[in-house]
Design a protein with these regions (language model features):
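Surface-exposed, secretory/extracytoplasmic low-complexity segments enriched in Ser/Thr/Asn/Gly/Pro
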Residues: 1-205
Length: 205
């Protein structure tokens, strides 16, 4: 019983997790999962559950919650989101470092919930493009030329998101194009980003 209580404390003692979206061919979207952060009185729970077991009866043990942090998107809230407003895809070749940067950036915005009246910032959501965060050196566009730099490829994610937001009818509040045309989106449909300098942002109006 003690090990079970410790396992529960360990599971719920982790940072909260948002409900995960699943997209379907008919244009609908469903969510599942999601978990809050909970800190509870382990000794009190163990004593209460132990008493129930020692009495040979069935029942529910009381849990004294000491601290709680809900995820940004709970499963209950997610059920209100059931339609895909817009989507967009871009293609990329085989480049290990660039592919890794795209993966990290895409994962950092996956499941982000922008409620009505709220705004989204790409730079805030993806965080620092640094080696500490897993980003690798890959080609980036500087003054119209490809140069090696940490985080090359993240602009493809911001461009893909920009087009999805645009097709969804969301208000684009910050967006800048690259110095020169890029291969993965039509001219005028790209969104470059530079940490601390250029951001892509939209508002859910």
């Amino acid at each position: 019983l003690g090990n079970k209580v410790k396992a529960l404390a360990s599971e719920y003692g982790k940072p909260p997790v948002n409900a995960e979206p699943s997209f379907h061919g008919d244009g609908s979207v469903t969510f599942s999962g999601g978990r809050p952060y909970l800190k509870f009185d382990e000794k009190a729970l163990l004593a209460d559950a132990g008493m129930i077991l020692s009495n040979g009866t069935s029942g529910k043990a009381d849990v004294s919650v000491l601290d709680e942090k809900k995820p940004d998107l709970t499963e209950k809230e997610a059920k209100e989101v059931n339609v895909v407003l817009g989507w967009y895809t871009t293609e990329f070749g085989i480049d290990g470092s660039r592919d890794k940067n795209i993966e990290i950036a895409a994962k950092s915005i996956k499941g982000v919930y922008v409620k009505p009246g709220e705004s989204f910032s790409y730079n805030q959501s993806t965080g620092a493009r640094s080696k500490e965060n897993g980003y690798q050196e890959a080609p980036v566009i500087i003054n119209g030329k490809l140069e090696p730099g940490i985080g090359g490829g993240v602009c493809q994610v911001s461009t893909t998101l920009f087009n999805a937001a645009l097709l969804s009818g969301l208000e684009i509040t910050q967006r800048a194009n690259h110095y020169s045309p890029i291969h993965y989106a039509p001219i005028g449909r790209d969104a470059t980003v530079a940490e601390g300098i250029i951001d892509f942002a939209f508002h859910n109006d």
